[in-house]
């Protein structure tokens, strides 16, 4: 029984990793899709992946993440616009605007862990960090270096903690 379970898990994990990652381009402006795919490809190119299929899958995971983030913010923006046009005032308006922000934050939190998990099917931890850094235009290094410049007395463990927090963010 144990052998069957192990073989089943190996088969399922192999099957899942062999699946192509589709680009979620339905109902999107073709120029926007082209722009996002191009931006995603630039990130993938820096990873030095040798397998074209893996590179395409990683590019699609990254592009789909950009699409997902855009969708989350578009929903938030539509709700904010609706609240502003509704005629609500005072505390009721503030509550409705806060609810829209809270829903956006919840959606971002729910999606936060799926992205590195999806990338981990194709990349190692160092490559995943390179993808995140590419998506944020190198903000981790810039922010980390700024912190070190502002607080030159940091101990090595404090530097490591700041770096870990920046990577997680």
What are the language-model segments listed below?
Residues 19-169:
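Charge-rich (acidic/polar
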Residues 1-26:
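Bacterial Sec-dependent N-terminal signal peptides
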């Amino acid at each position: 029984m144990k052998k069957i379970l192990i073989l089943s898990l190996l088969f399922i994990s192999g099957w899942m990793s062999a699946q192509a990652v589709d680009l979620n381009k339905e109902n999107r402006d073709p120029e926007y899709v082209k722009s996002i795919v191009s931006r995603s490809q630039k990130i993938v190119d820096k990873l030095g992946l040798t397998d074209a299929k893996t590179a395409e899958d990683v590019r699609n995971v990254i592009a789909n993440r950009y699409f997902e983030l855009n969708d989350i913010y578009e929903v938030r923006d539509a709700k904010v616009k609706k609240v502003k046009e509704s005629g609500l005032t005072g505390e009721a308006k503030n509550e409705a605007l806060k609810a829209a922000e809270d829903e956006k934050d919840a959606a971002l939190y729910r999606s936060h862990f799926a992205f590195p998990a999806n990338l981990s099917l194709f990349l190692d931890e160092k490559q995943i960090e390179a993808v995140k850094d590419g998506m944020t235009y190198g903000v981790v290094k810039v922010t980390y270096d700024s912190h070190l410049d502002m607080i030159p007395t940091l101990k090595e463990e404090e530097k490591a903690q700041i770096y870990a927090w920046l990577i997680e963010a």
